[in-house]
């Protein structure tokens, strides 16, 4: 099953709570509506309040991650993944995503990986 992960940063002007609320109520439904070949779309939030570096024996300086959410996108097969990428080249899709992301994301920091 093909998978992509995106490491995403919020705008510094948005609180963690407001970011999560907006992402769940607006951004995630938008992405799901634009990309019908998604088989799964999960988010894991990396907020400072959840940081455990002080309680675990890690070699870490305890600094907050530059990312605020890890998004995982899964697809049933390669064909669905390819349809996702094809759909992502549509000007309407690009504009809808950029308009929404401008409200909450520091888009220049987003990194995406294929992880299967």
Regions found by a protein language model. Give the residues of each.
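Macromolecular interaction modules
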Residues: 1-116
């Amino acid at each position: 099953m093909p998978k992509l992960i995106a490491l995403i940063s919020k705008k510094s002007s948005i609180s963690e709570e407001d970011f999560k609320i907006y992402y769940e109520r607006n951004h995630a439904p938008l992405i799901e509506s634009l990309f019908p070949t998604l088989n799964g779309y999960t988010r894991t939030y990396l907020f400072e309040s959840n940081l455990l570096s002080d309680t675990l024996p890690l070699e870490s300086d305890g600094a907050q991650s530059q990312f605020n959410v890890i998004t995982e996108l899964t697809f049933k097969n390669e064909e669905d993944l390819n349809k996702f990428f094809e759909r992502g080249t549509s000007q309407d899709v690009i504009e809808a995503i950029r308009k929404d992301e401008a409200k909450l994301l520091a888009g220049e920091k987003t990194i995406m990986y294929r992880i299967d």
